[in-house]
Amino acid sequence: MQSLHGNCLIAYARHKYILTMVNGEYRYFNGGDLVFADASQIRVDKCVENFVLVSRDTLSLFLPMLKEEALNLHAHKKVSSLLVHHCSRDIPVFQEVAQLSQNKNLRYAEMLRKRALIFALLSVFLEDDHFIPLLLNVLQPNMRTRVCTVINNNIAHEWTLARIASELLMSPSLLKKKLREEETSYSQLLTECRMQRALQLIVIHGFSIKRVAVSCGYHSVSYFIYVFRNYYGMTPTEYQERSAQGLPNRDSAASIVAQGNFYGTDCSAEGIRL
């Protein structure tokens, strides 16, 4: 038997199916049941094609894509380690995700497709009140992740330490202390989030510099250019030109995609129709 730790598991029962918990308990499922579970609480010894292991890194990329109001980032009471959603129809994409998950040498496009399909499967559980608490219990996100989640859900907002602390249900002094323990600050994270978003809008979406500045919360275009140059070592226009010429930049668009910094993307199960 293989015990899985530090990840989550999505299992799909095409027929009657049994999962064994680490405490020896058996959980029985009917055909059409889609299961989301804390992988550290599950033992898997057969039917590998029936489950997809979702890594902590992938889950961490899914979290910031959720709407701010959906996240209760304070301490949660103990929640179930397993959730079930019964699907009225077959899930044709599940087999593809399972096959991609077994392949250790995915091409770049396949990696992105696998991630997108996993996000779609995860979104099936969004209406379950226990999903977010379970997700957070597994991830136990650090303060950096929590702050970035708040910022990225409204990147253009005039964020202050007090406002972010309010969203996280804590005092500004406590937030400042926790960020200091992680060797960062709210202002540093605000700049990082805005600069990553700016790069996406410039390189991938082709926005004008003025539009990028406004979209990222900068009222002054000249100040935005100043911050961008300090962060990336060149102006936004220079970055655009180098990208158009195929010259290497310090942070390429491809690397940003690989890191998953697409916080503005909507995630839904539209198209799966479960």
Curated annotation (Swiss-Prot):
InterPro entries assigned to the protein according to its UniProt record, in alphabetical order: Homeodomain-like_sf, HTH_AraC, HTH_AraC-typ_CS, Tscrpt_reg_AraC-type_HTH
UniProt keyword list: Activator, DNA-binding, Repressor, Transcription, Transcription regulation
Residue ranges flagged as DNA-binding region: 162-183, 209-232
Key word DNA-binding present: yes
Source domain of life: Bacteria
GO CC annotation terms, alphabetical: cytosol
Pfam families in the cross-refs: HTH_18
Keyword Secreted attached: no
Domain HTH araC/xylS-type, first and last residues per copy: 145-242
Expression induction: Expression can be activated by RpoS and repressed by CRP, H-NS and GadW, depending on the conditions.
Molecular functions per Gene Ontology: DNA-binding transcription factor activity; transcription cis-regulatory region binding
S-S bonds: none
Quaternary structure (record): Homodimer.
Function comment: Positively regulates the expression of about fifteen genes involved in acid resistance such as gadA, gadB and gadC. Depending on the conditions (growth phase and medium), can repress gadW.
Listed name of the protein: HTH-type transcriptional regulator GadX
Source organism of this protein record: Escherichia coli O157:H7
Name of the encoding gene: gadX
